[in-house]
Amino acid sequence: MTERQLIDDFLAQKRIAVIGVSRNSRDFTRAMYNEFIRRGYDAVPVNPNAAEIDGRESFARAGLIDPKVEAALIMTPATQSEAIARECAEAGIQRVWFYRATGRGAVDERAVDFCESRGMQVVAGRCPFMFFPGPGFHGMHAFLVKLIGRYPR
């Protein structure tokens, strides 16, 4: 699959774990989590230090989520990504997105290689906000990325 097909397939799933969503309501991870909910996704928070996020049960690890999710957005530091990728594989999660806007984000090459070696679908980098339809700052960002030829096809 092309990168764009992987992104579209990920976003076509309805039940998605958001791994690394913060307890801090002002954190960017919460904005991302809330946007998935606003768009009708069943977003499942994963944070080992939170029993709930915005009234929804939070799980300590991907493998504890019940019922299972179809995909996982990983928004943790890259140093945690390989262990989280292994948890996702053990939990039967076949689609993972390692978030990155600037810097390294959650992208770790060992984690990406692990997932790909297991036949999992991987989006390594990028921000889901750029691929949600509609106006806004991230729509403008997506437009600019298209202009410079770096938008996935």
Task: For each feature predicted by the language model, list its residue ranges.
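Mid-chain, well-packed structural core segment of small domains
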Residues: 69-105, 109
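A charged, well-structured terminal subsegment
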Residues: 131-153
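Short N-terminal or domain-adjacent regulatory/targeting segments
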Residues: 1-12
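Rossmann-fold NAD(P)-binding glycine/threonine-rich loop
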Residues: 101-129
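A short helix->loop->beta-strand "cap" motif at the edges of active sites that frequently abuts
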Residues: 41, 91-96, 118-120
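Mobile, glycine- and charge-enriched loop segments
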Residues: 49, 54-77
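Conserved beta-strand elements of the Class I
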Residues: 17-19
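NAD(P)-binding Rossmann-fold cofactor-contacting core
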Residues: 22-26, 30-54
